[in-house]
Amino acid sequence: MSYIPGQPVTAVVQRVEIHKLRQGENLILGFSIGGGIDQDPSQNPFSEDKTDKGIYVTRVSEGGPAEIAGLQIGDKIMQVNGWDMTMVTHDQARKRLTKRSEEVVRLLVTRQSLQKAVQQSMLS
C-alpha cells in the first residue's frame, strides 16, 4: 500500500500498545524498523509496491516488549502515539519511537494478513 500526499488513506489497521522495558538509563522497545521517505523503496522486502516509502518492522526481539504486545516482522507503522508515520524519514520515525518521555508506545499498524483477510471476507 502506498500513500499519495493529499489523498485519503484506506487501510485495515491493528492497535499495538508496547510498554517499554527499562534497562538502566534506556527504555527498550524490542524491535527495529526500516524504510522512510529518504530510503530506497525498491529494497523493501515487505511490500509488493516498490514505490512504498513506509516505515516497516524489520526485526522483533524474542521475548521483548514488542513481541509481547503482538508486533510482527513486516508490520507497516501508520501512527505512533497519534503521529502520522506515512510520510516521515527513517530518522524521524526512529526519534518518534524512542522519545524518552514516553514509556508506552501506541501504534497503528497494518499487515498483509489483515488486508488479505478483509479481501477474502468481501469475496465470500
Curated annotation (Swiss-Prot):
Q: Where does the UniProt entry say this protein principally localizes? A: cytoplasm
BP-aspect Gene Ontology terms: negative regulation of cell population proliferation; negative regulation of protein localization to cell surface; negative regulation of Wnt signaling pathway; regulation of Cdc42 protein signal transduction; Rho protein signal transduction; Wnt signaling pathway
Residues with the N-acetylserine modification: S2
Residues that span the membrane, as ranges: none
Q: Which PROSITE patterns match?
A: PDZ
Tissue expression pattern: Ubiquitous. Detected in brain, heart, kidney, lung, small intestine and skeletal muscle. Detected in various cell lines including HeLa. Weakly expressed in peripheral blood leukocytes.
- InterPro entries in the cross-refs: PDZ, PDZ_sf, Synaptic_Scaffolding_LAP-MAGUK, Tax1-binding_p3
Residues with PTM Phosphoserine:
S61
Q: What are the annotated GO cellular component locations?
A: actin cytoskeleton; cytoplasm; cytosol; extracellular exosome; fibrillar center; intracellular membrane-bounded organelle; plasma membrane
Q: Which UniProt keywords apply?
A: Acetylation, Cell membrane, Cytoplasm, Membrane, Nucleus, Phosphoprotein, Wnt signaling pathway
| Localization per record | Cytoplasm; Nucleus; Cell membrane
Q: Name one Pfam family in it.
A: PDZ
Presence of the UniProt keyword Nucleus in the record = yes
Q: How does it sit in the membrane?
A: Peripheral membrane protein
Where in the numbering of this chain does the PDZ domain appear?
A: 15-112
One GO molecular-function entry:
beta-catenin binding
> What effect is documented for mutating K20A?
Abolishes interaction with KCNJ4
Record's subunit section = Interacts (via its PDZ domain) with GLS2. Interacts (via its PDZ domain) with RTKN (via the C-terminal region); this interaction facilitates Rho-mediated activation of the FOS serum response element (SRE). Interacts (via its PDZ domain) with CTNNB1; this interaction inhibits the transcriptional activity of CTNNB1. Interacts with HTLV-1 TAX protein. Interacts (via PDZ domain) with ARHGEF16. Interacts (via PDZ domain) with KCNJ4 (via C-terminus). Competes with LIN7A for KCNJ4 binding. Interacts with ADGRB2.
Matching PANTHER family: DISCS LARGE (PTHR23119), PDZ DOMAIN-CONTAINING PROTEIN (PTHR23119:SF50)
This chain's function reads:
May regulate a number of protein-protein interactions by competing for PDZ domain binding sites. Binds CTNNB1 and may thereby act as an inhibitor of the Wnt signaling pathway. Competes with LIN7A for KCNJ4 binding, and thereby promotes KCNJ4 internalization. May play a role in the Rho signaling pathway. May play a role in activation of CDC42 by the viral protein HPV16 E6.
Question: Would you tell me the protein name for this molecule?
Answer: Tax1-binding protein 3
Species of the source: Homo sapiens (Human)
Species classification: Eukaryota, Metazoa, Chordata, Craniata, Vertebrata
UniProt gene name? TAX1BP3
